Amino acid sequence: QTYLERDLQALRAVENLADFRRLMRAAWLRIGGLLNQTEMGRDVGIVQPQVHRFLNLMEASYQAIRLPAFAVNRTRRLIKAPKLYWSDTALALFLAGETEPRGTHLENLVLMDLLAWRDVQPRRPEVLYWRTATGIEVDFVIETPRRVLPIEVKAAARVGPSDAKGLEAFLDEYPDLADGALLLHGGAETFPLTRRVLAVPWWRVC
């Protein structure tokens, strides 16, 4: 028996496996994107309460991961849409017909390593993302009690200062919280990308 038939039905929350499978496929296709439950339900023909219940079940069973947004005001974090990721990057790659992690699949891989690192820290930091109303975005923000570290992920082997625009915007917005940032890339060298951004091969930190 599969995870679907055995484990989830044992939780007595999946009354329609066909609907659940459709929603899982929709989740796989949205890795790294903002979670819009209304849109997702409309795309797969599932009513909103069921979408909400199934997503909660995916998260409770360690399949889906909802990444919260960074905001200094913690109340605002609760109302901002989370980003959706998947706990099994290899499975997500297989279902997408890919063999190497690129784009959002590379983001997903990096996130899994960040979460594994977070879980063994004595003072557990938070892992979040940042996005402005105008669409400027940073893939991940590591928040400790005193400081934050913004991180951007690029699969390209060659990166330039223009790839750090989101990171620089974050550093400008929160000068009292962050004074540096990381850009993880697909190349082989570690070097200063800008005065405040260090470029590091992603495989050196994952």
Predicted features by range, described:
Residues Q1-V148:
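Accessory nucleic acid-recognition modules appended to NTPase machines
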Residues F94, G160-P161, T190-T194:
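Switch/connector loops and helix/strand junctions flanking conserved nucleotide-binding motifs
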Residues D119-P122, A169-L177:
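Arginine/glycine-rich "motif VI" loop of SF2 helicases in the C-terminal RecA-like domain
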Residues R131, K154, L183-H185:
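Short beta-strand/turn micro-motifs composed of small residues
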Residues R146, D176-G180:
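Short glycine-/polar-rich loops that comprise or flank the Walker A/P-loop
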Residues V153-P161:
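Short beta-strand-loop-alpha-helix junction that forms the active-site gateway
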Residues G186-C206:
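Domain-level recognition of nuclease-like catalytic cores that cleave nucleotide substrates
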